[in-house]
Amino acid sequence: MSLPQRPGKTSPRREETSAFREPSRRRRRESDSLSNNDPTSPRHHRHHRSHSSRHQHDIDEERAEEGGIRRKRSLVKPERGRMDPSHPNYLYRQKTQNMPTYNPMTGNEPLIHEEGEAETNSTPSMDSKRKDALYGAHGNVNKPMERVPTRHRSKKRKGSRKISKREAAAEKRRRKAMEQVRPPSLWTTYCSVITFWAPDFVLKCFGMPQKAQRSAWREKIGLISIILMIAAFVGFLTFGFTATVCGTPPTRLKINEIGSGYMIFHGQAYDLTKSTHPAAAGIPDMTNVLYDLPHKYGGQDGSFFFQEVNGACKGLITRTENSDIPTNSNGDLAWYFPCHAFNQDGSSEPNTTVSYYNGWACHTSGSARKSFYSLKNSGDVYFTWEDTKNTSRKLAVYSGNVLDLNLLNWFDDTQVNYPTKFKDLRDNDDIRGVDLTYYFQTGEDKQIGKCLSQIIKVGSIDTDTVGCIASQVVLYVSLIFILSIVIVKFAFALLFQWFLAPRFAAQKTSMGAVDSKARNQQIEDWSNDIYRPGPRLADPVPGDRMSKRASFLPTTSRFSSPYTVSNGGKQKPQWVTMASQNSTTRLVPPASGTTPSIYRQSHNGLGNVSVDNSRLNPSASRTSLVQDSRYSTVIPDSEGIGSAGYVHELVVPQPPPDWQPYGFPLAHAMCLVTCYSEGEEGIRTTLDSIALTDYPNSHKSIVVICDGIIKGKGEEFSTPDIVLRMMRDPIIPPEEVEAFSYVAVATGSKRHNMAKVYAGFYDYGEHSIIPVEKQQRVPMMIIVKCGTPAEATAAKPGNRGKRDSQIILMSFLQKVMFDERMTELEYEMFNGLLHVTGIPPDFYEVVLMVDADTKVFPDSLTHMISAMVKDPEVMGLCGETKIANKTDSWVTMIQVFEYFVSHHQSKAFESVFGGVTCLPGCFSMYRIKAPKGGQNYWVPILANPDIVEHYSENVVDTLHKKNLLLLGEDRYLSTLMLRTFPKRKQIFVPQAVCKTVVPDKFMVLLSQRRRWINSTVHNLMELVLVRDLCGTFCFSMQFVIFVELVGTVVLPAAISFTIYVVVSSIIKQPVQIIPLVLLALILGLPGVLVVVTAHRLVYVLWMLVYLISLPIWNFVLPTYAYWKFDDFSWGDTRKTAGEKDKGHEDGEGEFDSSKITMKRWRDFEKDRRLRMQAGWQLPVGGHPPMPYEPYPEY
């Protein structure tokens, strides 16, 4: 077994040696941090949970009091980070802290700090004692080095059993008291404030008598309020932001498009259709100047009728000596230009004639000016920049005003004097269409610019306000942002499909080439019928033995690390599996003269398999649990594990490690099938599909866990009875199998559960449609949760949920890998697997999790294991799930394309970064342990204590936890893996295919998607807090998860906004182009993906069906799910006979831990052998059971 070194454990001599080579500041920091894990410290406590965090807190306080530098949370090396319970690897560190450590391959002594050792210079006698303690009495370097317990610790262990019950009761009372005085959290306070209008007595009247129900309802309203606020913000950003910052733009009329009902004065248009002019020379009383006079003024510019004089132009424009323009005592002029109108297009020539009298039509009187200023303008006249470049006019811009420099020609040189710069501007053709604001910034030039704006302004330039510009910027940034996400997801999905996915899959299987059209057609035909068996397997691919030609040049030196596996320069990388690291004599060998076909033996070719008793030499390796030297005293050579009592006579022999039928080393795989209430036909086809996979049956075994004694609706037999009929050649007759206890994932008395273990080989049935020559002999183990005797008369005895079934296997694998105390059930599981496979359980590296209603394509298992072996960083993966009942109803039709897009776009995109956020529980694979460093070093992944502990959480007291653990446990397992191992990968393997049946009734679909959507929201809330995922800032998986979370909660609002935009674009003008283009890209790119990846045009039709059903997917289902946030039932997904609506979280009574026996495997096995020798009839443990302790002492 791979046993990592204890972190944080350093010998005193190593500390003293390193101290002379390092600065004092660094030495002081390290001594402080290392003292946290020093077992000789007076603060050392047997409960590791409180030891680390509390002791480090005391150290920080002491250093602060002494005036030292307080330890900061930032810029701390990972190995010095604080190991508090919130750390992702906290439990793993606690488990490995006091584990036995093997002699490293470097030749140096392990750094083990013995308890009670004085920090003094060693003597030869002490060195010899230390060596004996480390390497054993006989100096066997292959034996593990265990800590020798002190007398004080031995006394504590002896007395711990007597006070365990009393301590447990006291701890329970203390926790209950703490819960009563626990201050409310910020979230609880917010939910209480937001639901102040619904006091508890009102909620009791509406069917919420329990406090937990009312609390869940308040949390639901709190979440809905946040969703509404996010939706309101998105709506404001979409529709209200522009109206707020830009405001309602004033009415503006474009030059040369102003009708005859208007006149223009100083760049503004006035509607004079209903106006009348008083009597004047040449103008009758009550006359409309637009139509009633001989000269029609409609559409003309009358700025010279009401000239702005004596303003900024005073001093610049003056009266000549012989001028007829009247002035006052201040020298103010009455007018500058002749009082005539001109065409708005600037085509009028200067007119200096005078009608009736001097100053006629100049409106210099106060009453005339007052009447003009009282008029309300209809809008500004605006010019575009293209209009200012018109060659027929000489237009320029100053401070947003359009100046017609041709109007300077209307000056009468005999009447007024004006600056020569006016003439220079008039005669300069280079300033046409130029903004002159910069040139008229200071001094006299600035006054000239203002003067020109008052006398020759003909309009304004077409510009937006700052608010409008800001709204446009926000619009385009949002557009670019959304388009970037959509296009990048599309491009990366294609990148994964074309270039990355083929690297993971096996190059060739029994079904032919991976990318062959024939295989794709076989998959489509196979997936159209749920009960259709897989295609007939072709002849096995010829085995491949890797070339081991030695290199002439050396590949290592004295400086090479012994932990590094050399690849020999540019040679093919050496993939590592458990079998490839162990000698072939340690496994069940094939008979002499056998061919690779023996590793796929069928039931026709049963015969005696020779078993070598010497294959499990304890001193040969340190990889396997049962081969460890610790068991040499328990299992003597005369009764080796290979005896008839341990290994089934029909066990499938193990091939040599270098046999590679598919181009990669074979890894041992468990195929976990969880059953609840499925019928015989469904379970039969599922197990047939797994047993018939082309992966060698020497490296796969089927583990079926039945979740209680359940009878499906309309079934004749219960599910366990159906499954037991599918096993042959059991090691123990089914009627003689006993039930054993284990700790279930439940509360109250249900935490104690019992199960039976059956081990044998898969039976294809008497009337199987599978040809006999194709029936492989596959090891099989069945675990039936039958419940305690107290629940024998209950409706569903033993039922604890799917998560409990998964934890049975996960906890078993953890205890096997860490050699922890196990329950009686786990001991029977260990022996059962060993009986039917001939290999110890810790040889298994991966586990395939399949639902009982899911059928696997024959070469899917091969492709999945290929990805695991080729990339040790992959810790989880999933394949594509196809729908078998596509055309059963309109409900199934709308799901076809949704399944396709979720795999080939969403999961393919996430696979590029190795962060698939959801590995579906119906068809996924997890890595049990991964190779780390050099030879025979492995680290737990799925068997990691942090994964098992958090996934087996039984205190589910908040809405968030209930949605994670009761509704979406499969997705939460993926979340836990990413949260604990953010640097490892979870990917999608499109070559691995399965099929399943989806809901064909809308109410069932509604119930299923309610669970999935709520689970998605809460799992994304967990993942968005993981900071160590791939990438940084906007280019990171964390940001992608945040966008996905926001996109999920605003789905109802988004589809509502989309429908509004489409309808408004049809019935209103102008058409909103940008939102429509964006909508077309979002909905159209998946269609391109279909054509590129699916190679079947029929999926385009499925896409159209999906688009029609978008209101259901994006509005009906999410809205229903959000309103049902506090509903934790499974609804109508699967019914059983006589089922009552009661969840797995309901628990009554008290948990009695004394009913569960927990011991290490070697202790169980020693007692068993003692009973066999003495003929005793005692319990399995051989003596009264040991109380269950959740935190064992090492």
UniProtKB/Swiss-Prot annotation:
SUPFAM superfamilies: Nucleotide-diphospho-sugar transferases (SSF53448). This is Chitin synthase C. Its EC number is 2.4.1.16. CDD domains: Chitin_synth_C. Residues 12-23, 55-69, 76-85 have a biased composition (Basic and acidic residues). GO terms for biological process: ascospore wall assembly; asexual sporulation resulting in formation of a cellular spore; chitin biosynthetic process; conidium formation; protein localization to bud neck. Glycans are attached at residues 351, 390, 582, 608, 885, 1014. Residues 1-91, 136-177 are annotated as: Disordered. It catalyses: [(1->4)-N-acetyl-beta-D-glucosaminyl](n) + UDP-N-acetyl-alpha-D-glucosamine = [(1->4)-N-acetyl-beta-D-glucosaminyl](n+1) + UDP + H(+). One of its GO terms (molecular function) is chitin synthase activity. The chain crosses the membrane at residues 221-241, 476-496, 1039-1059, 1073-1093, 1097-1117. It comes from the Eukaryota. Residues 42-54, 150-164 have a biased composition (Basic residues). It is found in: Cell membrane. The gene is chsD. GO terms for cellular component: cell periphery; cell septum; cellular bud neck; chitosome; incipient cellular bud site; plasma membrane; prospore membrane. It is a multi-pass membrane protein. It holds the Pfam family CHS4. Belongs to the chitin synthase family. Class V subfamily. Disruption phenotype: Leads to reduced chitin content and vegetative cell lysis. Results in a remarkable decrease in the efficiency of conidia formation, when chsA is also deleted.
